[in-house]
Amino acid sequence: MQVKNPILGLCQKATFALSAAKVEQCPDDQGYEVAFAGRSNAGKSSALNTLTHASLARTSKTPGRTQLLNFFSLDDERRLVDLPGYGYAKVPIPLKQHWQRHLEAYLGSRECLRGVILMMDVRHPMTDFDKMMLDWARASGMPMHILLTKADKLTHGAGKNTLLKVQSEIRKGWGDGVTIQLFSAPKRLGLEEAYKVLAGWMELEDKPVA
């Protein structure tokens, strides 16, 4: 008898729901949401597209162009949320400040938010933004799972060494509440582990399939 993770089927059926410039425009605050965060060019959109087997999240050659909260429905009560990229976008400072205010408002107010997937480029982990997100997760008690993206850019050994180093730094600075893994969108590395995290947060049990 096979055991199938039901989150896989839901992710494959993911559809775009809406974009929100501010919290008031978000869907009703009920059900289950998992948010995807990351510094610009950390591979957030590519990871989302790989997890959903679709081109839902916009990828751009200009990092940081995700300016809105983008919601994707898995079913009637479960959603993935693509948060604005942080960093390199060539936009006026007031607009960046606008993004940050509404990002903070979203993270601080959504009762249905069950966890945050934080993307870090495995070659440049633990940026100031990453540490800020880790501080927020610790202070709020929000579960956080880190994808060390672009693992295909390093050798297997170098990737494992970076994973262990970042794990150690996080454990010392933020405790044991944060989980972490290697991930590569082009190589589809780490998909099963990421799906298990999503299933747990969205309260989907593994179900036997005949």
UniProtKB/Swiss-Prot annotation:
Ranges of residues in domain EngB-type G: 30-204
List of residues binding GTP: 38-45, 64-68, 82-85, 149-152, 182-185
Single GO term (MF): GTP binding
Membrane-spanning segments: none
Single biological process term from Gene Ontology: division septum assembly
Binding, Mg(2+): S45, T66
UniProt-listed Pfam families: MMR_HSR1 (PF01926)
One GO CC annotation: cytosol
PROSITE patterns from the UniProt entry: G_ENGB (PS51706)
Keyword Cytoplasm among record annotations: no
Keywords: Cell cycle, Cell division, GTP-binding, Magnesium, Metal-binding, Nucleotide-binding, Septation
Entry cofactors: Mg(2+)
Signal peptide positions on this chain: none
Keyword presence, Cell cycle: yes
HAMAP family: GTPase_EngB
Family listed: Belongs to the TRAFAC class TrmE-Era-EngA-EngB-Septin-like GTPase superfamily. EngB GTPase family.
Annotated function: Necessary for normal cell division and for the maintenance of normal septation.
NCBIfam families assigned to the protein according to its UniProt record, in alphabetical order: GTPase_YsxC
Official protein name in the record: Probable GTP-binding protein EngB
